[in-house]
Amino acid sequence: MKMRVVGTLLSSPFGKWGVAAILACAIASAVAAPNPVSGPKPSDGGYQTSAAHAILIEADSGSVLFEKSADDLIPPASLSKLMTAEVVFNEIKQGRIKPTDEYIVSTNAWRRGGAPSRTSSMFIPIHSKVAVDDLLHGVIIQSANDASIALAEGISGNESAFAELMTKRAREIGLAKSTFGNSNGLPDPRQLMTARELGKLARHIIETYPEYYKYYGEREFTWNKIRQYNRNPLLALTIGADGLKTGFTKEAGYGLVGSAVQNGLRLIVVVNGLKSEKERADEAKKLLEWGFHNFQSGLLFAA
């Protein structure tokens, strides 16, 4: 039997694992599954963040290290494209579509998500045929709304049906509260998620689709001679970040779901409701650094 846990780095005669190691070993003798360990909460004098909603998760065990209003339903903006991509990943995995399949960019996708929309876009010409894999790159790297709608229409016939599929799929992977009204995250009263479920979704993508998760770490993508850059500011920092997604609408504020690895410890951070791109990047970075500084993951028991 083996057990991996996350412990606070404490000073004690027993070394840096301190009391956490002793307790973990005791638990490991009776329990084989990882035991989530909660870190300090804002209400008890722990870490503070200006994000309205936040959570920090240790990816291997699912341990919650920090949370703030993590179960409030919020408009996720483009963070909901994580669910859009998950549905596409699953369709490929189930053999219902292939990355090389081509979908036509409809007038609707072009008008609502392309150049005329003045939103994040791949700038796909109307009625063009684009491979699923290219559309996925557009959604993941550029947050392209035209690509999101094209995928939705290609898979489900129309965006409303795809949004229903997103909600259904969310339930299948354990997201009990999330609901969707569109594929792109633009304002819709049905488009609601929580910070906790965004973190769960990120963890699911990382664990289930490693061959596609790597797309989230790509710094740029060129299609039709148009080069666009990844919107995730964490990728430019030296903190081990390799994903995932940013989001913004006036209603939602600035949000980010990110992940980084240091010394074998992967953390997932979610922040939302921030006032600027800079504050979003700063708060996500600080929370990750706090996690890496205060927690460590390791194999404590094997038999």
Question: Predicted segment positions?
Answer:
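Residues at the start of alpha-helices and the adjacent loop-to-helix junctions
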Residues: G18, I22-A24, G46, A54, ...
